[in-house]
């Protein structure tokens, strides 16, 4: 059973503390293989989802300013994000659906969450509009990015709770976990 409402065609995930968590103390994101593990419970929560052709489309939207600061390359960031998605969902998203901001935290760019740029890029890649898109994240910047992009938002903690209850809400639900106007 999918934990997502039936109107969803595209699920965009944040990466850190949503799909994966860092295993290196005092490091906010992984810089290489072996420095992360799947977020506990997320793999099980997504086990009933069919991804790819005939199923849901997937994207990733992640702030990766560690590229700007020289801690990892853009290629490594892309690989680690795709590896995390595959480890958690069993499906490797197409590279064009994996979007990240490599700018400095204070760059003021249009892509760094809470700006909506990364979400819009993932939707454009898949040809899916905001009304059929859900963004799953863990932070207030994720919620704000979803609102600014006009897409529904689901907190990862609510995803885990929903997966246990197996009762997806309807579109326009008053539930705080999936709401167009959060």
Label every model-predicted segment:
Residues 26-31, 69-77, 107-110:
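Short, flexible/disordered intra-domain loops and linkers
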